[in-house]
Amino acid sequence: NQYLEHLGIVFYYGQDKVSLVKTDSIDMASKKSLKRHKYKVEGDVSVEMLTSCFEGDADDVEVTAMVHKFTGESSFRITVLPNNHGVRLRRCSDQELPRQCARVWVDGQDAGVWYLADSNPYKRWIEDEFEIPESLTRDKSVLNIRIVPESREEGCPVSWNESAYEVFCYME
């Protein structure tokens, strides 16, 4: 039996300040939440309950929630802190179908493309994120978001869906 001795040094480059602050959330199963956020969805819309699991360590824990699937677009209003340095929008969704892609608009300005390539028909819940730059969020307390699904490849169906959103502001 041979014993090995390991030495190491760990450097932590962190800040004592909070850098992300949660400012809002939208629950697709709550009519009150949808109304408060002025949530609208267009196109072919299907609303269904999904019971499945997330990938990862707790991949045997079932979660049940409502999912909005659509081919048109969705829009909603979120609350942010005016002195933010950008916003992170986190979506909870069903990843059964691959290549979920949508163009994101913030107050009528193009914020870029949100793309989720992965799929998992067995562990269907996933959370993914979209970063909204400070140039579109600074000095605002409310953002009007528009999500317009698009197809990544010719002949591929549009496959965007939403179960919940969480909003985080980058702060100094």
Language-model region placement:
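Activation corresponds to long, low-complexity, non-globular regions
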Residues: N1-V63, E162, F168-E172
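Beta-strand-rich ligand-recognition modules
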Residues: V21, G56-N84, C92-E172
